[in-house]
Design a protein with these regions (language model features):
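Acidic (Asp/Glu-rich) catalytic motifs at the cytosolic membrane interface
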Residues: 1-13
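Catalytic cores of Mg2+-dependent Asp-rich isoprenoid enzymes
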Residues: 10-174
Length: 174
């Protein structure tokens, strides 16, 4: 989800959009006619999606910490991705009018620091939680569970089950 947010403008340039139109409609945004930078409504929708992505990252951290500490390789793989995703979400939040993924790309030094810290703390769940809190500091956070509409289930059927409208996902080409 983080890469979808980061790469929104590159995807758009090649004729693809993976953002949920249902969510952006609430902000008065038609993704098919979106100008570069998107404007205020688009940025508000992106902030909401950052909150949802942040919630997913927290769930992924909980899952990762269920992996035994002796399984250093798989933990490290997951932790690097989680740390970089959190830092990328912060960059997107800090630069809401970005028009290219390169403008919100995590620096090489931040990548190296994320890897070093994750490697150091890989077996220490409490330290990993503190590191994640630092990486995710200031990010909005969607509340509660974040259900996703299963593939093949139309939005109307999903809404009928009383799933929160702001949490519906969609995608595809524009």
């Amino acid at each position: 989800m983080t890469n979808i947010l980061k790469d929104v403008w590159e995807d758009r340039a090649r004729g693809a959009c993976w953002l949920p139109q249902e969510l952006f409609t609430r902000y008065g945004v038609d993704l098919a006619t979106l100008p570069p930078g998107g404007g205020a409504g688009f940025q508000d929708g992106m902030i909401e999606l950052i909150g949802i992505a942040h919630r997913h990252l927290r769930n992924a951290l909980d899952f990762t910490l269920l992996i035994p500490g002796e399984e250093v390789g798989i933990r490290r793989f997951c932790l690097w991705a989680l740390g970089l995703a959190a830092l990328t979400l912060r960059k997107i939040q800090e630069h809401p009018g970005f028009t290219a993924g390169t403008q919100v790309k995590v620096s090489r030094s931040a990548v190296a620091m994320t890897q070093t810290l994750a490697n150091f703390a890989v077996r220490n769940d409490a330290m990993l939680r503190r590191l994640f809190e630092r990486a995710a500091r200031g990010l909005p956070l969607a509340t509660g569970d974040v259900p996703l509409r299963p593939a093949g289930v139309p939005p109307a059927a999903f809404e009928a089950e009383e799933a929160p409208a702001q949490l519906q996902c969609g995608g595809g080409s524009q």
